[in-house]
Curated annotation (Swiss-Prot):
Predominant localisation class: nucleus
Start-end of Basic residues biased regions: 849-864
Keyword match Nucleus: yes
Origin organism lineage: Eukaryota, Viridiplantae, Streptophyta, Embryophyta, Tracheophyta
Name of the featured protein: Protein TORMOZ EMBRYO DEFECTIVE
Disruption phenotype: Defective embryo arrested at preglobular stage characterized by aberrant cell division planes leading to an abnormal cell patterning; longitudinal division planes of the proembryo are frequently replaced by transverse divisions and less frequently by oblique divisions. Altered embryo patterning genes expression patterns.
Domain of life where this protein originates: Eukaryota
UniProt-annotated stretches for the region Disordered: 816-876
Subcellular location: Nucleus; Nucleus, Nucleolus
Tissues expressing this chain: Preferentially expressed in dividing cells in a variety of tissues and meristematic regions.
Bias kind Basic and acidic residues: ranges: 819-831
Protein role: Essential protein involved in the regulation of cell division planes during embryogenesis which defines cell patterning, especially longitudinal division planes of the proembryo, probably via the regulation of embryo patterning genes expression patterns.
BP GO annotations: cell division; embryo development ending in seed dormancy; embryonic pattern specification; rRNA processing
Source species of the chain: Arabidopsis thaliana (Mouse-ear cress)
Pfam families for this protein: Utp13, WD40
């Protein structure tokens, strides 16, 4: 068999991060994206795969309200700081902002024209703003509580605004009224608790208001009277109406026909949907207040009574066209309901689930032979199964009473995908992932079940390790994988394996051995099925977090809190290799590439790729901001998944082959471009050559080209032409190159010349827009000042030399006159005079004793000069 090629690099292909932290959200008009508040940032999330398309950074202000313009080009936000901001979704920049309320803004609505924005505040006020000008156009007061719901009437002829408040009232405001007393058209008082949501019928004639008093009131907007009150017997958080002409409307009409037993549905009927604390979707008919549909059970999984606060929906919205219904849960999940036509009937099903926040990731494993799904155990009582392609939550396995700590997966002989989970409730559960049901429950442990593992060959058992220090083998014989009710699992054998908690278990690929790693800093190997002790692996200085058998060799790998990974011989328990490189505890390690390599992750947030034979760390990846607790490796695809305390799930793909192809392609392209550059230089096409040199990132070649241009007669025109063809990014590179050239005296003249021409071409407004220009100029200024001072000294010295040579009659005065104009000679004399004046001042400041010594030196020099002159005369 041909050996597998070693992997050299992995790339993070997909990430699932927190994109919604509860609070406000808004759906685009076409349903393609959702703007979600996540702390002080706004995430624009693709509704198909939960990927974050863009992020709008806030200003450390917790967001309380969001709204979109009708054309989805502008996003409005407000927070606790009372600042209202308008964002351009194309540039992600704040185009204007203002303050108006005396308290946080709790709700927002944009007019159909896009020119007006209504805000509802905790200060009991309702304000209307001009979007372009940012000034207040209407000011409404009257509510006696926090105003939380607000909407414009869709009919522009009516020009009214509707608001709902915690004072249990709904008010209708006239935007055309000039008299203050006539601004409030109606006060609708039928609720006995806070109004949480308001909605309008499609014809705009009926208003629906839902409240925490467990009723929905229907209001006639002709006379503002209450047409009906619908008792729902649950605290309501949202009410929305069903639009006609959609598959959802057809589904509701068919329900109406079955309920009323009529051949045709009532065309005049209005249908509305309510959601609330029970976590079920209910569809109502306004005429007669009839409940046409109610979910049999909630899709929100809450296993304990203490978690009732997480049950229920907090908001709902009808999506455009055939996208269905969107409901938001209290635990930051988005449920997408759609209509599905079956053979017997049409049903409302949960088609998609986007999880806004996963909490801490404890464990994860790939599902099935094709590894299209990923089972994830978070800091919850449930296991979430994600579609790897879209990273949307396909389904949830709920049944444990406390947090799930560990899991493992396998494919049974019948082809069903099985999942085993261990929890803090001291039980293990066996799940059929195909039917999404629990088929077995195992009890008997007296501590948290920290590790579970399936058999690798026969799939007839699984093992579990617990905080009670025992290792158990559970039998799967006789278990029906299609059972509707879970049965009690039985143990084959049990042993007190360690002196402290068992953190990890692993089964050998031939099902003959099982290895355990413990808090007592040792790992033990046991013979199956009777759990006879084989050998103890001693050598780690801290607790062991992970153990795994090699797929090809008779060895086992352990990862420990002492920052090392060790490989041990099974035969005698000796340590074969020790791998060091992590800066903190190593939490997981797993073999890849048929045991010739392995990956490890740790509390330092790093993922490392190792070669076993060379003990070399090939690559290190930093994509987590907290401990990486979970590591899953695909057996078929060898795709890697990591999850950590930062609630982030990263998917990694082997990019060795693609990187090699990219490097070859880049090298080939660089050769071709390099030849093109040389041809351009030979043809004296300097503009093209400089452009190519920038593209190839060759600063030395750029310098040679500019240096050659400076020696040309038409250098000014050529350099200006070359600089005008550069882009903004290339100008940034040019400034970087000039900064480096400017530090060297031999290159500074060209650097200063290019810099001078660049400043003449680029206006200051464009120079400021160059990325990092401030730092670049800071590096240019000191050396430029130094070069200027040096050249200035040379110029001054040259004038002194000319004067001296002229006085000594070395230079013909007439030549000096012709070479230097009168003004230049005047400058020269001024310089000499200034220097003589400086010399006189220096003499005056010198102590008398030094002046005497200078005079004596002057006399001796004069005598020496006289003697030399006499000697020369005698010689003549």
């Amino acid at each position: 068999m041909a050996p597998h090629s070693l992997k050299k690099n992995y790339r993070c292909s997909r990430s699932l991060k927190q994109f919604y932290g509860g609070g406000p959200f808004i759906v685009s008009s076409d349903g393609s994206f959702i703007a979600c508040a996540c702390g002080d940032v706004i995430n624009i999330v693709d509704s198909t795969d939960s990927s974050v398309k863009s992020t709008i950074e806030g200003e450390s202000d917790t967001l309380t309200a969001l709204a979109l313009s009708p054309d989805d080009k502008l996003l409005f936000s407000a927070g606790h700081s009372r600042q209202i901001r308008v964002w351009d979704l194309e540039t992600l920049k704040c185009i204007r902002s203002w303050k108006g309320h005396e308290g946080p803004v709790m709700g927002m609505a944009c007019h159909a024209s896009g020119g007006l924005l209504a805000t509802a505040g905790a200060d009991r006020k309702v304000l209307v703003w001009d979007v372009d000008g940012g000034f207040c156009t209407h000011y409404f007061r009257g509510h006696k509580g926090v105003v939380s719901s607000i909407l414009f009437h869709p009919d522009s002829n009516k020009n009214i605004l509707i608001s709902g408040s915690d004072d249990a009232t709904v008010r209708v405001w006239d935007l055309n009224a000039k008299n203050t007393e006539k601004k409030c058209l109606a006060i609708m008082e039928k609720h006995f608790s806070a109004v949480t949501s308001i909605a309008l019928s499609e014809d705009g004639l009926t208003l629906f208001s839902a409240g925490r008093d467990k009723v929905v009131n229907l209001w006639d907007l002709h006379d503002y009277s209450c047409k009906a009150t619908v008792a729902t017997y649950e605290v309501l958080e949202a009410v929305t109406t069903v639009s006609s002409g959609t598959p959802f409307a057809s589904f509701v009409a068919s329900l109406d026909q079955k309920k009323s037993k009529k051949k045709e549905s009532d065309s005049q009927a209005t249908y509305f949907i309510t959601v609330g604390e029970r976590g079920v979707v209910r569809i109502w008919k306004s005429e007669g207040s009839i409940c046409l549909y109610e979910q049999k059970s909630s899709d929100i999984t809450v296993s304990s009574d203490d978690e009732e606060s997480k049950r229920g929906f907090t908001a709902a919205a009808m999506l455009p066209s055939d996208h269905g219904l969107l409901c938001v849960t209290a635990d930051q999940q988005f449920f997408f309901y759609s209509v599905v036509e079956n053979v017997e009937e049409t049903e409302l099903v949960l088609s998609k689930r986007l999880v806004g926040y996963n909490e801490e990731i404890a464990d994860m494993k790939f599902l099935g032979d094709e590894e299209q799904f990923l089972a994830v155990a978070t800091n919850l009582e449930e296991v979430r199964v994600y579609d790897v392609a879209t990273m949307s939550c396909s389904y949830v396995l709920a049944g444990h009473k406390e947090v799930v700590l560990s899991l493992d997966t396998c494919v049974s002989s019948s082809g069903n995908v099985l999942i085993v989970t261990g929890s803090k409730d001291k039980t293990v559960r066996l799940w059929n992932a195909t039917s999404k049901s629990c088929i077995g429950v195992g009890t008997g442990h007296n501590g948290d079940i920290l590790a579970v593992a399936f058999a690798k060959k026969s799939f007839s058992f699984f093992v579990s390790g617990s905080g009670d220090r025992t290792l158990k083998v559970w039998s799967l014989d006789g278990i029906s994988e299609d059972s509707e009710e879970p049965i009690n699992l039985k143990t084959r054998s049990v042993v007190a394996a360690h002196d402290k908690d068992i953190n990890s278990v692993a089964v050998a690929r031939n099902d003959s051995l099982v290895c355990t790693g413990s808090e007592d800093r040792t790992a033990s190997i046991w013979r199956l099925p009777d759990l006879v002790h084989v050998v103890t692996l001693k050598g780690h200085k801290r607790r062991i977090f992970s153990v795994e058998f090699s797929t090809v060799d008779q060895c086992v790998m352990t990862a420990s809190g002492d920052k090392t990974v060790k490989i041990w011989a099974i035969s005698d328990g000796s340590c074969l290799k020790t791998f060091e490189g992590h800066t903190s505890s190593v939490l997981r390690a797993s073999f890849i590439t048929d045991g010739t390599q392995f990956v490890s992750c740790g509390a330092d947030g790093l993922l490392k790729l190792w070669n076993v034979n060379t003990s070399e760390c090939i690559a290190t990846y930093d994509q987590h901001e907290d401990k990486v607790w979970a590591l899953a490796v695909g057996k078929k695809t060898e795709m890697i998944a990591t999850g950590g305390g930062d609630a982030v799930i990263n998917l990694w793909h082997d990019s060795t082959a693609s990187d090699k192809e990219d490097d070859f392609r880049k090298e080939e392209e660089a050769i071709l471009r390099g030849q093109e550059l040389e041809n351009a230089v030979l043809d004296a096409e300097y503009t093209k050559a400089i452009r190519l040199a920038f593209e190839l990132c060759r600063p030395h070649k750029v310098f040679e080209l500019f240096s050659g241009l400076c020696r040309k007669r038409d250098s000014d025109e050529q350099i200006v032409k070359a600089l005008q063809g550069l882009e903004k990014e290339e100008f940034r590179l040019l400034f970087e190159y000039v900064r480096e050239w400017n530090t060297k005296p031999k290159l500074c003249h060209i650097a200063q010349f290019v810099l001078y021409k660049t400043f003449n071409i680029l206006p200051p407004t464009e120079i400021v827009q160059v990325k990092g220009i401030g730092e670049l100029l800071e590096g240019l200024i000191p050396y430029s000042q130094r070069h200027f001072s040096r050249i200035d000294r040379f110029v001054r010295s040259s004038f002194l030399l000319d004067y001296t040579l002229g006085e000594m009659s070395v230079i013909d005065p007439e030549t000096v006159e012709t070479e230097y104009p009168k003004d230049e000679k005047k400058k020269e004399k001024d310089v000499i005079a200034a220097m003589e004046q400086d010399t006189d001042e220096l003499k005056q400041e010198t102590p008398s004793r030094k002046r005497k010594s200078q005079k004596s030196k002057g006399k001796s020099n004069k005598k020496r000069l006289i003697a030399e002159a006499q000697g020369s005369v005698i010689a003549v």
